[in-house]
Amino acid sequence: MSMSKLDSLFTAALEQAAQRQVRRRLRRATAAPPGRLALDGRTLVNFSSNDYLGLARHPLLAERASLWATRHGAGAQASRLVCGNLDLHEQVEAKLARLKGTEAALLLASGWQANAAVLPALFKAAAAQGEPQVYTDRLNHASLHHGCQAAGVRQIRFRHNDLAHLEHLLAERAGAPGARFIVTESVFSMDGDRADVPALAALAARHHAFLYLDEAHATGVLGPRGMGLAGLAPGGVDLAMGTFSKGLGSFGAYVAGSRALCDYLVNACSGFIYTTALPPAVLGAIDAALDLVPRLDQARAALLGHGERLRASLAAQGIDCGASSTQIVPAIVGDAGHALALAAELERRGLLAVAIRPPTVPAGTSRLRIALSAAHGEAELDQLIEALAAGWRAVRQAA
């Protein structure tokens, strides 16, 4: 068996992570019906998936993925600027732009790649105006911070969802050189709370700032026709980034905005230029999801209603769920050991709700990140509420 020269360091780092109760391990899952997961020989009700609308197992997505793969092949064969720009890519982009109400859209390989590569390209375009002023929410996803760090720009961080603080920071630097960017999310993945997008857009307009909005966890679930919260802002936002891997049940990501913006990214975004294009099967699933999602208002309403009911139950049990107002409901228990124990209690009762610990969330805020799905019915929600109450009692008694 081969060993690397650094295995001793890797092993030591893993041991330290285990001592802090933050070591992670992969668990093998197999296919199960929507809203469920087969894990270690058991079928569990799945409250950890980002498949918010239950589309990952929808027959139309599977059928169109298979059809497009059969007709067009298993792969795109190259990056889009070489010879991988299929008519299918442009078809999906045009459909997405129509639904988003933007001039154009551009497909990318993943949400992480989009944020990590698009942000540096934007900052490069503005370099002639001086060092860009980049205002970021303190709880932004790691990929947004990574994109800023990759560009070598200084982040001016505002308190989470605190638009008064953001406006104060912008006013402090009024007249300073450099293009202004506000980078934030519409729905925050670990807390399930929302940004006030119309107010953000108005604030950005007042301060002549470019608004970059990550809609990964809103796409499919929130906003007009399920197309995200950018649609609530008159005139939209400068750039909306979103994914197809969560509410839309497939894979990949997009940016939507002006034609000039998307054409510029084709020429300047490394993550677009140097990556093999999305394959036909993935494009087929995306295309099918885009046909379905605008018609799922009833499913979205039921999903958000489940969130309201769960939050009320957690509050009655004395479990903090922060400012959640979406399908993502954190059960914040603080201690990493308590979060692991509560997750184990739920799994013993047939439910999967994974514990989230530092560094994914700040120290002292370990939690179960409960992700609801339209595939869950009232019976599954009842089961979750009962298991949380019993499990939390058991954890506190054992502490």
From Swiss-Prot:
Q: Where does substrate bind?
A: 24, 141, 360
Give the EC class as a word: transferase
Q: Which reactions is this enzyme annotated as catalysing?
A: 6-carboxyhexanoyl-[ACP] + L-alanine + H(+) = (8S)-8-amino-7-oxononanoate + holo-[ACP] + CO2
Q: Which residues carry this modification: N6-(pyridoxal phosphate)lysine?
A: 246
Keyword Transferase recorded: yes
What are the entry keywords? Answer: Biotin biosynthesis, Pyridoxal phosphate, Transferase
Give an example GO molecular function.
Answer: 8-amino-7-oxononanoate synthase activity
Q: Does the keyword Isomerase apply?
A: no
| Annotated EC | 2.3.1.47
Q: What is its pathway? A: Cofactor biosynthesis; biotin biosynthesis
Spell out the PANTHER family in the cross-references. 8-AMINO-7-OXONONANOATE SYNTHASE (PTHR13693:SF100), CLASS II AMINOTRANSFERASE/8-AMINO-7-OXONONANOATE SYNTHASE (PTHR13693)
Subunit structure comment from the entry: Homodimer.
Q: Please describe what this protein does.
A: Catalyzes the decarboxylative condensation of pimeloyl-[acyl-carrier protein] and L-alanine to produce 8-amino-7-oxononanoate (AON), [acyl-carrier protein], and carbon dioxide.
Belongs to which family? Belongs to the class-II pyridoxal-phosphate-dependent aminotransferase family. BioF subfamily.
Q: What is this protein called?
A: Putative 8-amino-7-oxononanoate synthase
Which species is this record about? Bordetella bronchiseptica (strain ATCC BAA-588 / NCTC 13252 / RB50)
